[in-house]
């Protein structure tokens, strides 16, 4: 039985003991006690006609409690498990493995960090797809189209607290502060991204980069900080992690508008339908302030392929894709240089170099400007 499920069962058992204690000293019906003390919580017995008349006679077999907790957990996790079953790029797990070449955590500790990050990332995608009104995720229908918006939001929130509960497995009180700070950063970054989109405010490149450090870098930093507090080595990787987060997000922005494979997995140029101010779009708008055409297209949240292709042509005319590739090349070179400095004291790390190789972008090869 998993740690989290065991904790849930213990909670229910403590509740039953509490009920029995109060029932022994108060003449109170089960219905009245529940309504006065546990409003909003589900009953263990859904049919009140089958409930005993007084609390002192309440008896619930432990097997029944186990079955109920298992059933609730399975239902609530539905959207989360749905997305977990669809393979992703797994870049975060690869990143954790790469840094562990230096930090040398044992497998059992590393596994806990991976699980926490994977569940948090998956939960954030559930929310992200709702906020962006997405239709596809990893080539499949988004979870909220299968399970509904309300259940998907609840499943994502449930996942956050599931992982918070796992922090005690790390065995360091600093883990909770690290976890809280990282989730705050993630939500701050996401909030600014949504604000610019919904208010139709085009940020500067500097503002966008800062947002990415919060939004994308939040989980990257969480993973590395949880690893560091368990390692005998205490090297500060924050600069490298920030660079990797920015590279990852700008590359994702580029691929959204240029990659045919991305279109199959996420939808054709979905950032345009979302109305998102991604890196190439920001550059194009600011490179041609006298023209409002691209901004006007962005406002429409269009799903029309011809209009999207027109938007791409505008970005090509302002050199925005070339500029984005040059930015990625510069950031990658900076990251590689930083890795080499770290390697002089920590030893070779081929894993990080492979990550950077994976984040290299291809050049467009067809008439639509998409590879």
Curated annotation (Swiss-Prot):
Going by the UniProt record, its keywords in alphabetical order are: Isoprene biosynthesis, Magnesium, Metal-binding, Peroxisome, Transferase
Q: Please list the residues that bind Mg(2+) 3.
A: 252
Q: What is its main location?
A: other
What note does UniProt attach to the cofactor annotation? Binds 3 Mg(2+) ions per subunit.
Q: Which gene encodes it?
A: paxG
Where isopentenyl diphosphate binds, per the record, is at: 89, 92, 121, 138
One Pfam family per UniProt:
polyprenyl_synt
List the InterPro entries. Isoprenoid_synthase_dom_sf, Polyprenyl_synt, Polyprenyl_synt_CS
Per the record, where is site Important for determining product chain length? Answer: 160
CDD domains noted in UniProt: Trans_IPPS_HT
What cellular-component terms does GO give this entry?
Answer: peroxisome
Q: Where does Mg(2+) 1 bind?
A: 128, 132
- What GO biological process terms does the UniProt entry carry, in alphabetical order? paxilline biosynthetic process
Sequence similarity:
Belongs to the FPP/GGPP synthase family.
Q: Which GO terms describe its molecular function?
A: (2E,6E)-farnesyl diphosphate synthase activity; dimethylallyltranstransferase activity; geranylgeranyl diphosphate synthase activity; metal ion binding
Q: In which pathway does it act?
A: Secondary metabolite biosynthesis
Quote the PANTHER family the UniProt record gives: GERANYLGERANYL PYROPHOSPHATE SYNTHASE (PTHR12001), PYROPHOSPHATE SYNTHETASE ATMG, PUTATIVE (AFU_ORTHOLOGUE AFUA_8G02400)-RELATED (PTHR12001:SF70)
List the protein's name.
Geranylgeranyl pyrophosphate synthase paxG
Q: Which residues take part in binding dimethylallyl diphosphate?
A: 137, 215-216, 249, 256, 266, 276
Q: Report the residue ranges where the short sequence motif Peroxisomal targeting signal is annotated in this entry.
A: 369-371
Question: Which cofactors does it use?
Answer: Mg(2+)
Q: What does this protein do?
A: Geranylgeranyl pyrophosphate synthase; part of the gene cluster that mediates the biosynthesis of paxilline, a mycotoxin that acts as an inhibitor of mammalian maxi-K channels. PaxG, the geranylgeranyl diphosphate (GGPP) synthase is proposed to catalyze the first step in paxilline biosynthesis. Condensation of indole-3-glycerol phosphate with GGPP by paxC then forms 3-geranylgeranylindole (3-GGI), followed by epoxidation and cyclization of this intermediate (by paxM and paxB) to form paspaline.
EC number, as in UniProt: 2.5.1.-, 2.5.1.1, 2.5.1.29, 2.5.1.10
- Fetch the PROSITE patterns from UniProt: POLYPRENYL_SYNTHASE_1 (PS00723), POLYPRENYL_SYNTHASE_2 (PS00444)
Locations listed in the record? Peroxisome
- Enzymatic reactions: isopentenyl diphosphate + dimethylallyl diphosphate = (2E)-geranyl diphosphate + diphosphate; isopentenyl diphosphate + (2E)-geranyl diphosphate = (2E,6E)-farnesyl diphosphate + diphosphate; isopentenyl diphosphate + (2E,6E)-farnesyl diphosphate = (2E,6E,10E)-geranylgeranyl diphosphate + diphosphate
Q: Which pairs of Cys residues are joined through disulfide bonds in the record?
A: none
């Amino acid at each position: 039985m998993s740690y989290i499920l065991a904790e849930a069962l213990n909670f229910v058992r403590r509740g039953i003991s509490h009920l029995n204690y109060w029932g022994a000293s108060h003449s109170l019906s089960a219905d009245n006690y529940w309504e006065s003390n546990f409003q909003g919580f589900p009953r263990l017995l859904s049919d009140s006609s089958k409930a005993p008349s007084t609390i002192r006679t309440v008896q619930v077999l432990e097997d029944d409690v186990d079955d109920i907790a298992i059933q609730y957990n399975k239902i609530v996790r539905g959207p989360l498990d749905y997305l977990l079953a669809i393979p992703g790029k797994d870049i975060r797990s690869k990143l954790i493995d790469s840094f562990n070449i230096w930090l040398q955590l044992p497998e059992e500790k590393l596994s806990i960090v991976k699980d926490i990050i994977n569940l948090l990332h998956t939960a954030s995608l559930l929310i992200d797809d709702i906020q962006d009104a997405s239709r596809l995720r990893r080539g499949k229908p988004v979870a909220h189209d299968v399970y509904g918006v309300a259940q998907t939001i609840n499943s994502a929130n449930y996942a956050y607290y599931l992982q918070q509960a796992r922090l005690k497995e790390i065995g360091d009180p600093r883990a909770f502060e690290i976890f809280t700070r990282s989730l705050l950063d993630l939500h701050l970054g996401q909030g600014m991204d949504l604000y610019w989109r919904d208010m139709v405010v085009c940020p500067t490149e500097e503002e966008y980069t800062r947002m990415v450090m919060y939004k994308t870098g939040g989980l990257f930093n969480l993973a590395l900080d949880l690893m560091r507090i368990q390692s005998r080595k205490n090297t500060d990787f924050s600069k490298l992690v920030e660079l990797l987060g920015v590279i990852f997000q700008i590359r994702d922005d580029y691929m959204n508008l240029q990659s045919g494979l991305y279109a199959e997995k996420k939808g054709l140029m979905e950032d345009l339908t979302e109305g998102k101010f991604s890196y190439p779009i920001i550059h194009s708008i600011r490179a041609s302030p006298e023209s409002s055409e691209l901004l006007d297209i962005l406002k429409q949240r269009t799903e029309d392929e011809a209009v999207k292709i027109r938007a791409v042509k505008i970005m090509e005319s302002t050199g925005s894709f070339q500029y984005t590739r040059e930015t990625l090349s510069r950031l990658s070179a900076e990251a590689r240089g930083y890795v080499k400095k770290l390697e002089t004291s920590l030893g070779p790390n081929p894993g990080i170099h492979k990550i950077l190789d994976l984040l290299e972008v291809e050049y467009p090869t067809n008439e639509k400007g998409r590879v």
